C-alpha cells in the first residue's frame, strides 16, 4: 500500500501531465491559426500546380464521367481527361494567346479554351479561370466563406459570359493550404461534380 506522501506525489504528477497536455493542445491550435492567417494569400500566388481527380458531367440528357489531370505552369493550362481504364478522351492546352484541343484523333485551335471545348465536345467547363475557382481562391463579391475563410459558394461568370454556381463541399489540408477536395459547378441544367486529390505545388 502506498504511503500518503507517495499518493500526493502521484497526484501531482498526473496533474502536471494533464496541464502539459493542455498546453500542447493550445500551442497546436495557435500554430494552426498562424498557418491559416496566410494560407489563402500564398495559395492565390501559387501559379505552378498539378492535381488529379475525377469529374462527372450531368445534364438532363446524359451523364459522363472521367479521370482528370490538371496542370498549370505560369500562364499555361493543361487539362487531360481519360476513361477509368486510362484511355485518353481529350487534352486541352491554354497559353496566353492560344488554345489547343486534341480530341477524337484531331487537333483544333482557338484563342479561348472554354469556348473551344464547348464548341467541339458540347462539354461546358470554365477552363480559362481554373487557377482561381479550382483552388478555391476565387475573389468575387458573391463569395461566401466558412469560419476558416474557405470558400463555400460563389455565383460567378466565366470568360464566355456563362454564370456558374460553385459549391465547395469539402477541403483537405496540405502544404499549409486548405485545398478543395469536392466541389460542384452548376450552369442552368448542367452540373459538374469534381473530386480532387494529390495536389502538387512547385
From Swiss-Prot:
GO cellular component: cell outer membrane
Organism superkingdom: Bacteria
InterPro entries: LolA/LolB/LppX, OM_lipoprot_LolB
Disulfide bonds: none
S-diacylglycerol cysteine lipid sites: 25
PROSITE patterns: PROKAR_LIPOPROTEIN
Keywords, alphabetical: Cell outer membrane, Chaperone, Lipoprotein, Membrane, Palmitate, Protein transport, Signal, Transport
Localization (cell): Cell outer membrane
Pfam families tied to this protein: LolB (PF03550)
Topology versus the membrane: Lipid-anchor
Family matches, as CDD domains: LolB
Record carries keyword Endoplasmic reticulum: no
SUPFAM superfamilies: Prokaryotic lipoproteins and lipoprotein localization factors (SSF89392)
Signal peptide per UniProt: 1-24
Lipid attachment residues per UniProt (N-palmitoyl cysteine): 25
Summary of the function given for this chain in its UniProt record: Plays a critical role in the incorporation of lipoproteins in the outer membrane after they are released by the LolA protein.
Self-association and partners: Monomer.
Designated name of the protein: Outer-membrane lipoprotein LolB
Species of provenance: Pseudoalteromonas translucida (strain TAC 125)
Lineage per the UniProt record: Bacteria, Pseudomonadati, Pseudomonadota, Gammaproteobacteria, Alteromonadales
UniProt gene name: lolB
